[in-house]
């Protein structure tokens, strides 16, 4: 099953697809998109269960990759350059393994093609606290999350996922329960299918200087 993906596009040139990270949305990479629009036709895509895209159950890496492939079909993109951050990097790698001809080149930011241990318990607790409180302001949500998350930058990132409802209270734009159910599958390593052709296109991995998501053991 696939869902409709929301996207925005701008610029001119070869097609470049940007895929965001867990709990994010396409406009998280807005600065990157604007910087590259003078050289590329940049498409910022919301992954399933994120942003303004549709919600679904069973959104593992192969399913997310297939949703992106179908989005490409809908927009007439036979192939494109890809830049994926975190979860978006995993989805891009999965697409490269499943449908290598659809990628002209691949840039993966701050994630490796491996399975990761669970590391978001505090974040899920903070998100649950905000969801249960029906906060009337972003400041209230920020204060609630600060009781569980020490990093202010993480709190500010998550606040971007809030949307105000008709009753004035804030709720998460992303599918919190769906992401929770699929969390183990999203932590898995991208994997190709038996007999599938390997992806042999240009690939660049970018490691954050203070991040531990790409370690020396992944080099």
What are the residue ranges of the model-derived segments?
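Conserved HGGG/HGGXW glycine-rich cap/lid loop of the alpha/beta-hydrolase fold
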Residues: 5-54
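Conserved catalytic-core motifs of eukaryotic protein kinase domains, centered on the activation segment
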Residues: 28-30, 53-59, 117-120, 216-217
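Residue in the alpha/beta-hydrolase core beta-strand immediately N-terminal to the catalytic nucleophile
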Residues: 46, 81, 104-107
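Conserved acidic catalytic loop of the alpha/beta-hydrolase fold
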Residues: 63-80
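Gly/Ala-rich beta-loop-alpha elbow adjacent to hydrolase catalytic centers
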Residues: 84-88, 92
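Flexible "cap/lid" loop of the alpha/beta hydrolase fold
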Residues: 93-98, 103-136, 215
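Conserved alpha/beta-hydrolase catalytic His-Asp/Glu region
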Residues: 118, 133-187
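Conserved serine/cysteine hydrolase catalytic core
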Residues: 167-219
